[in-house]
């Protein structure tokens, strides 16, 4: 996952991905 971006690892929360990094 990437900061500030929705990706396959999960949605972002407070600028950080919900799962993964």
From Swiss-Prot:
<keyword id="KW-0964">Secreted</keyword>
<dbReference type="GO" id="GO:0005576">
    <property type="term" value="C:extracellular region"/>
</dbReference>
<comment type="function">
    <text>Injection into mice produces severe neurotoxic effects such as circular movements, aggressive behavior, dyspnea, tonic-clonic convulsion and death.</text>
</comment>
<dbReference type="GO" id="GO:0090729">
    <property type="term" value="F:toxin activity"/>
</dbReference>
<keyword id="KW-0800">Toxin</keyword>
<keyword id="KW-0166">Nematocyst</keyword>
<keyword id="KW-0528">Neurotoxin</keyword>
<protein>
    <recommendedName>
        <fullName>Granulitoxin</fullName>
    </recommendedName>
</protein>
<feature type="region of interest" description="Disordered">
    <location>
        <begin position="1"/>
        <end position="21"/>
    </location>
</feature>
<dbReference type="GO" id="GO:0042151">
    <property type="term" value="C:nematocyst"/>
</dbReference>
């Amino acid at each position: 996952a990437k900061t500030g971006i929705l990706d396959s690892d999960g949605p972002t929360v407070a600028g950080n991905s919900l799962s993964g990094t």
